[in-house]
Amino acid sequence: LRRSPRFKAMALIPMQDPPSAVAELRRAVTELGMVGAYIPSNGLKKHLSAKEFWPIYEEAQKLDCAVGIHGGSYSDLGFNTFTKFPGTRALGMPVPLAIAMTGMIQDGVWDAFPKLRVGFMEGGTGWIPMIIDRLEREQEYGELHCQRPVLDYFTSGSFYVGCEGNERALSNVVNLIGPQPCMFASDFPHDLVVQRVPLGLLGVEL
């Protein structure tokens, strides 16, 4: 964006072809000046924690860039039998983020790439206490084999989450994992009500 150097771009990379995704991530960061890549929370043939995607995370760690996981892909989540859309949208954002984070913990993504930085976006923060509680129970049962306590994966500087100031769960989440992982989400460049868009942004050129 030419409007301000404070705006940074994230690349969309072809996750269906991991070698091409690695090459595109490298090009986006080293040639185009982007700061990372956005990938879908679900909808791929395999979970984001599948080994075939690990070269992407390895490259992101090597480049010291971020990976953003975006909620909102409603496929294969059981919403196809809902009779109204609001329930799909309400759950379709946080649920796949919870699934993605769970897989990345239990399948060892962060154990393999401890400096990988991942942001979980558009799903709020309410899902975080739930999976921490549930996964800690699995660790206590001896069924979840991780190199660290579950909470550490949220507080080590690798995990980030987009949040909104009016979330009821936000204060509890901050008490649980601290404020550092929480990023205020403006949802720029779109807004549900155009009158709320600051006048200074109306002239932004892409």
Predicted regions and their residues:
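Catalytic pocket-lining loop regions of alpha/beta-barrel enzymes
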Residues: 4-8, 19, 25-183
